[in-house]
């Protein structure tokens, strides 16, 4: 486990190639037709009240934010829930280990990377469905549609106006090439 942590958090600044470490936020390269990408919401901020202008939960608790990504009409990813927060963050990396796992378990990149996987098409789009996760019934916070041609490699920040259908103030959607090295992915995802 310690070795995996070192691999995921160590950067290699002398690799001589074009690593993801050098891509600043909001200014990455355009996506390439036919190429596959990881896509996830690295940050979601909600307005202080729900779509009806009321408190998210009873008492003074904030919303329990989760999101789903749909592509080609199919749900391809569901996030973990971030409890009692108006501003939720996801790193794109998650490793759930038990003490028994520390004895020789290997983790594949597909297990560690928590993101949607899709192939770019300039006519394609994704839907991000954001909810307040509740025990009885999840409350809608917003359904956002993003044209893939508007996304860039790296972090893509977008703000939204509040109305009766939307309580999402802002999203940061991160897009990374699937063929990146695990070291580059880990470095970029932890930022």
Spell out what each predicted region is.
Residues 3-19:
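Hydrophobic single-pass membrane-insertion segments
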Residues 20-23, 31, 181, 185-191:
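Activation corresponds to long, low-complexity, non-globular regions
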Residues 20-66:
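C2/C2-like lipid-binding beta-sandwich modules
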Residues 63-75:
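Extended low-complexity, serine/threonine- and proline-enriched intrinsically disordered segments
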Residues 44, 72-74, 131-133:
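Solvent-exposed coil/turn segments that connect beta secondary-structure elements
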